A protein has these predicted regions:
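Catalytic nucleophile-loop/oxyanion-hole region of alpha/beta-hydrolase
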Residues: 70-77, 92-128, 138, 143-146
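Short, surface-exposed "cap/lid" segments of acyl-processing enzymes
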Residues: 49-84, 90-93
Length: 355
């Protein structure tokens, strides 16, 4: 019976990912709520209440995006899971809204988990955790927090996350993925490089002023692209060349020189967000899902992550891009990949989300 329920749940989730971005399932009530932040300030929180709850709870942590908990793809995913009777929470993590990859993100992540464990009905109930992209990195890091070691989540799943920031950035330079000697070429999305420069350019000395570049990056991470473009037009000299290298992913000598400065002078911060340096200490059962067509983080990052974790389940699928389902597949390939997804999600539902 549990096998049938898990397969049905997986099918509902896949159906939701294709249909729930622009429509709400009638079996799920959505609520804009709030929770007390680190300083007890009201912090936005989206809650998805199934009409027929099965008692399972999932916290879905967003990636680095100005849209945060309101990101359409996050909401689609939450709906697609909640239709199976699972109560889903998407908390705002304020530093991620500002695209600041600081250690405070971990504090907020653990803080919300602790707060949720104090809420009526959740005090003694197991909670499942999920993280998207950079949110996945922080969920993994949170598993090593003393509170989560004492009261661990029932299951952990990460989507499109990275293993080593440095190797992820190498993919951004050239779009090359070397998988078992096979070279795969993709056109990278510059978002990860934009976020990296947004975080570290103001912390290093590159030999000339970069205030203009920093202002452009601030506008870009806030999705203010028109204002950013206008400011780019006003830049001159080294700053103009640098911002074009960043947004066009030109692997110039100057671009590589500055990246080298980041990895040298900001090493501690970068290691903090690179599971390579600490994931071996994670004992939780972790489900890892990554798309072969992901242009933000290469799928080989998840393969490396899986090899270092002691208790993990991995699926690399051609049907997924970073946050969406791919339409660039033959019907036969799509059916084959769909069956793999159903098998993987069924195992995940049995391991955490089904009572």
């Amino acid at each position: 019976m549990n096998q049938i329920r898990s397969i049905t749940s997986a099918l509902r989730t896949l159906n939701g990912l294709q249909n729930y971005e622009h429509s709400r399932p009638s079996s799920v009530n959505e609520e804009d709520d709030h929770y007390p932040g680190l300083s007890n300030e009201d912090t936005p929180l989206k809650v998805f209440h199934p009409q027929n709850p099965n008692g399972a709870v999932l916290v879905l942590y967003p990636g680095a995006s100005a849209k945060g908990e309101a990101h359409p793809k996050m909401i689609t995913l939450a709906r697609s899971i909640a239709v199976n009777g699972i109560q889903v929470y998407i908390p705002r993590i304020p530093p991620l809204i500002d695209l600041k990859l600081s250690k405070s993100i971990l504090e907020w992540t653990v803080h919300f988990y602790r707060w949720l464990k104090t809420q009526p009905g959740h005090e003694n109930s197991p909670i499942n955790l999920a993280g998207i992209s950079f949110g996945g990195v922080i969920v993994l890091k949170a598993c090593l927090d003393p509170f989560l070691l004492q009261q661990p989540p029932k299951s952990v799943i990460v989507f499109g996350t990275s293993y080593n920031v440095k190797t992820s950035m190498e993919f951004m330079y050239n779009g090359r993925i070397d998988h078992n000697g096979n070279i795969i070429k993709l056109t990278p999305d510059p978002w990860s490089v934009i976020v990296l420069f947004h975080n570290y350019l103001n912390q290093v000395d590159v030999g000339y002023p970069t205030n203009g570049v920093q202002k452009v990056l601030q506008l870009m991470v806030r999705d203010q692209d028109d204002q950013a473009q206008a400011l780019i037009e006003d830049l001159v000299g080294e700053e103009k060349v640098l911002i074009k290298d960043i947004i066009e992913l030109n692997m110039s000598d100057e671009f590589n020189r500055i990246m080298g400065i980041f990895f040298r002078d900001c090493a501690d911060q970068i290691e903090f967000i690179s599971p390579k340096y600490w994931c071996k200490n994670i004992s939780n059962e972790v489900y890892i899902l990554h798309g072969t067509n992901d242009t933000l983080s290469p799928f080989t990052e998840s393969i490396k992550l899986d090899s270092e974790l002691s208790n993990s389940h991995l699926l690399i699928s051609g049907i997924f891009k970073h946050r969406v389902l791919s339409s660039e597949m033959s019907i036969f390939s799509k059916w084959k990949e769909t069956l793999k997804i159903i098998k993987f999600l069924s195992k995940y539902y049995r391991g955490g989300l089904l009572p």
